[in-house]
């Protein structure tokens, strides 16, 4: 084993051993801006405001120009926060640039709601528009009319409930609809819906009503969430936190995709996480965090991980989310998630359960090229494609898909990487390699040579970029805006590099295409 392989295993082991701190998530423009706005005084928060200003793009908006659908919430939120920070150098100019940006934007919600709309868009965007309207007067910015009936319907439902239980999914967007702090209660971590923005909004309302002990818990949560960004700037917070189920689940699942799940060098760290997941999985399943509502996606991936570790978890926890032959991520979901059903399919096949309907749904949701690109939790088509290939091949050693393979190889960029935006990313290149890893096992020699050539080009690209970045460069995960679960992404990057380094004549991937 060469030095780089040893280095990869060392870093993976270190990442896995850190996963008891609630998780690591990159900084969020939207949540930071909302927390600053709800926090009151600008004094003492200049560093966070400076960070917010530094994230503004040259066109006046916030968020990646590659993915315009996810720019509205951070831009609205930043504009509103900076509007009241006028004395700060650059704030007034930033507000003017943001206003011009919004005036130029086409409204993606003019007539319908896109399938991959950000989390809580129907509640958040109309609320932000309403706040901005009182500040900007007659500015002709997008009004998002298709979201208004959805928001109204949601508010009617919320109006019929005095208090939502801790961890309810709608609490994640409390900042967009909540006004009475008694209608929500901080969870055991001190958060409202594992959301810094929601918690900051709740805290601001609670302060006015004298809920001092609860305010202290919210403050402690916001400080811990800020540390989780690794930005080193007090007041800069992530889009979601904690993620103490999602982070370990997805990391171990990724190790499986790369054939690393059972690697002896990672055995102890994997066993610790598996034992924790086994103890936490109840009859209702698991959510992204211990104190958040269970969902089908986290439950399915947890079942996969436990079965891969030799446990025999009950499938009943997943059945709660089954409606007909589909799995909803959570009750009341606006539109079905392809990746949730991909993960459910993988879990069912690993557990030896019938899955014909789910398999048919996954197959039916390909694009004309045979890939999967209509995903609501990740902006890149490479994420659901890698996971779909693994799920469809599970238990079927001879599974082949020439159409998907051809499309995947054709999508490789001239530089050797893959990416859904204007540039290749390490994360997405790793997903491409995971898919090729599964496909390679059942290919004819000619196909394997084509795959090997693509992997060699990818390896050259990856070797020039494998050092860990100080902060995530390209958030690709869909929340209220695009965000980056730092460790989850880094595990994927390292696992992809490991695969590329060790490509060549080999046995099929650990667990890929074989029964457990």
Curated annotation (Swiss-Prot):
Residue stretches of each PFTB repeat: 45-86, 401-443
SUPFAM superfamilies in the record: Terpenoid cyclases/Protein prenyltransferases
GO-annotated biological processes: diterpenoid biosynthetic process
Gene Ontology MF terms in the entry: magnesium ion binding; terpene synthase activity
Keywords: Plasmid, Repeat
Keyword Repeat in annotation: yes
InterPro entries, A to Z: Terpene_synthase-like, Terpenoid_cyclase/PrenylTrfase
Protein name: Uncharacterized protein y4kT
Organism per entry: Sinorhizobium fredii (strain NBRC 101917 / NGR234)
């Amino acid at each position: 084993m060469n030095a780089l392989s040893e280095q990869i295993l060392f870093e993976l082991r270190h990442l896995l051993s850190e996963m008891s701190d609630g998780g690591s998530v990159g900084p969020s423009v939207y949540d930071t801006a909302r927390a600053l706005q709800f926090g009151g005084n600008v004094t003492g928060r200049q560093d966070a405001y400076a960070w917010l200003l530094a994230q503004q793009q040259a066109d006046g908006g916030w968020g990646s120009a590659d993915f315009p659908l996810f720019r509205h919430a951070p831009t609205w939120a930043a504009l509103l926060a900076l509007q009241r920070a006028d004395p700060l150098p650059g704030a007034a100019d930033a507000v003017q640039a943001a206003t011009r940006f919004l005036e130029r934007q086409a409204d993606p919600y003019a007539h319908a709601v896109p399938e991959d709309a950000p989390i809580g868009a129907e509640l958040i965007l109309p609320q932000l528009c309403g706040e901005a309207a009182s500040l900007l007067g007659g500015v002709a910015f997008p009004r998002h009319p298709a979201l208004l009936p959805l928001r109204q319907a949601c508010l009617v439902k919320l109006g019929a409930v005095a208090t939502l239980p801790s961890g309810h999914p709608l609490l994640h967007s409390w900042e967009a609809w909540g006004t009475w702090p008694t209608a929500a209660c901080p969870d055991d971590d001190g958060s409202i819906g594992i959301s810094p923005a929601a918690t900051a909004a709740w805290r601001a309302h609670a302060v006015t009503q004298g809920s001092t002990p609860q305010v202290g818990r919210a403050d402690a949560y916001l400080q811990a969430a800020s540390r989780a960004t690794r930005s080193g700037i007090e007041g800069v917070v992530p889009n979601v936190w904690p993620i103490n189920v999602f982070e370990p689940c997805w990391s171990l699942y990724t190790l499986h995709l790369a054939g690393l799940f059972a690697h002896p060098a990672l055995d102890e760290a994997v066993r610790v996480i598996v034992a924790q997941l086994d103890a936490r999985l109840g009859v209702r399943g698991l959510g992204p965090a211990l104190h958040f509502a269970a969902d089908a996606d986290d439950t399915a991936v947890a079942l996969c991980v436990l079965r891969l570790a030799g446990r025999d978890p009950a499938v009943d926890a997943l059945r709660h989310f089954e409606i007909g032959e589909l799995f909803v991520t959570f009750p009341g979901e606006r539109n079905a998630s392809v990746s949730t059903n991909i993960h459910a399919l993988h879990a069912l096949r690993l557990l030896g359960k019938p899955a014909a309907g789910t398999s048919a749904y996954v197959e039916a949701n390909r694009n004309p090229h045979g890939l999967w690109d209509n995903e609501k939790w990740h902006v890149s088509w490479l994420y659901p494609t890698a996971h779909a290939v693994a799920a469809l091949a599970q238990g079927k050693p001879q599974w082949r898909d020439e159409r998907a393979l051809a499309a995947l190889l054709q999508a490789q960029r001239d530089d050797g990487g893959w990416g859904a935006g204007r540039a290749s990313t390490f994360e997405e290149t790793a997903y491409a390699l995971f898919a090729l890893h599964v496909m390679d096992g059942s290919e004819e020699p000619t196909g394997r040579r084509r795959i090997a050539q693509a992997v060699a080009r990818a390896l050259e690209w990856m070797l020039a970029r494998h050092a860990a970045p100080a902060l995530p460069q390209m958030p690709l995960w869909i929340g209220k805006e695009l965000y980056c679960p730092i460790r989850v992404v880094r595990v994927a990057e390292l696992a992809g590099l490991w695969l590329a380094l060790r490509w060549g004549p080999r046995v099929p991937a650990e667990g890929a295409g074989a029964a457990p």
